[in-house]
Amino acid sequence: MLTARSKDLFTQAQEFIPGGVNSPVRAFKSVGADPLFIKKAFGCTITDADNNSYIDYVGSWGPMILGHCHPQVVEAVKRAVESGSSFGAPTELEITLARMVIDAVPSIEMVRMVSSGTEATMSAIRLARGYTGRDKIIKFSGCYHGHADALLVKAGSGAATFGVPDSPGVPVDVAKNTLTAQFNDLDSVSKLIDENKNEIACIIVEPIAGNMGTVPPGEGFLEGLRSICDSEGIVLIFDEVMTGFRVAYGGAQELYGVTPDMTTLGKIIGGGLPVGAFGGKKDIMKLLSPSGGVYQAGTLSGNPLAMTAGIETLKLLQADGFYEQLEQTSRRLAEGITEAAKSAGYPIYPTRVGSMFCTFFTSNEVKDWPTATTCDTKAFAAFFRMMLEKGIYLAPSQFETAFVSIAHTEVEIEKTIVAARSCFAAL
């Protein structure tokens, strides 16, 4: 495909925007290509600046579960903007969306709207610290919870005692309060708690890890975290920014039957507009200002356009058979890609939960960050580029989740599988 216009725009962008993009993964660095600049999208397709169209499995990194430009959402937002785009004051729309979220998500009794997933997770952690009077937190290697300083930490040789900053600009004094365990490893969690008795405010986890590819929780893992937190007086936070309303209407906590103390949300609840939320038990949430002393605020929190898009999106998700249809489509795609690799004799380890999926370029089981890193990232990059040439837009990183939307039909799924057969055979 010809992408001269995208290349020209990328050159221009690098003069004015660091790295030419406003979020690092968009630069396509890990797949050895220049990024596509997108000018429009509809349904399950996106169109770049050179008028090439692609079947989209990124979906703006998860929000577009309905597909792009769903007419009902678009019309609702058009009506809303005619009344004003931002007020900095309470609206009835906030109450409506809050009620819908509370009705859907088992753990949420009260909810605070914010403007991003990062804002939601950092605020939830602050609130957990205020609630418990403790400073340290536990996260999991390979789980991403936004770019707040306390969360840009990974495991190192000394991580059982102190966190190690994962980015320049993160003070060691901030990072030392973030302890890192291994996903799907309860023993690593128990060890950290034993070494930091009565100091852990919260454990934050993606119930389905979606930022090291797609890695489901092992049997008993989430239940074990719930039990540990109950016995140690620790707040359990599920980061459902990605999984919320994606793997089930009530999120991963509905799917797996494990209820955390707090939940963070984003992506889908804004219908494609910037949004985030965090909620949980009333006795925790009531500590949030102005009803309590834990401070959190935001100029655009509860933005009426985002609330409108979220309300309309959640209404559509309640349609009879919505998640069953999404599951059927997603299963067909994942099975087809797996069969394509098998037919070509190419080793992969496929994972999927609902409409989240990943094709790991390894023959090994992937259950955590160390096993995810055994993947052949160069082979994935080659596969990505070949698929892109065939009009298939996958997540431009081995360690990102891909998404299916309700707008994907049998036609797009079959075209994707045919392309995968050809590309695996060419590797």
Curated annotation (Swiss-Prot):
Q: Which GO terms describe its biological process?
A: protoporphyrinogen IX biosynthetic process
* Record InterPro entries: 4pyrrol_synth_GluAld_NH2Trfase (IPR004639), Aminotrans_3 (IPR005814), Aminotrans_3_PPA_site (IPR049704), PyrdxlP-dep_Trfase (IPR015424), PyrdxlP-dep_Trfase_major (IPR015421), PyrdxlP-dep_Trfase_small (IPR015422)
Cytoplasm as a keyword of this entry, yes or no, is: yes
An example of a Pfam family matching this protein is Aminotran_3
In terms of superkingdom, the source organism counts as Bacteria
Report if keyword Cytoplasm is assigned: yes
**GO CC annotation:** cytoplasm
Q: In which pathway does it act?
A: Porphyrin-containing compound metabolism; protoporphyrin-IX biosynthesis; 5-aminolevulinate from L-glutamyl-tRNA(Glu): step 2/2
Question: Which Gene3D superfamilies does this UniProt record tie to the protein?
Answer: Aspartate Aminotransferase, domain 1, Type I PLP-dependent aspartate aminotransferase-like (Major domain)
> What protein name applies here?
Glutamate-1-semialdehyde 2,1-aminomutase
Q: Which organism is it from?
A: Geobacter sulfurreducens (strain ATCC 51573 / DSM 12127 / PCA)
Gene coding for it: hemL
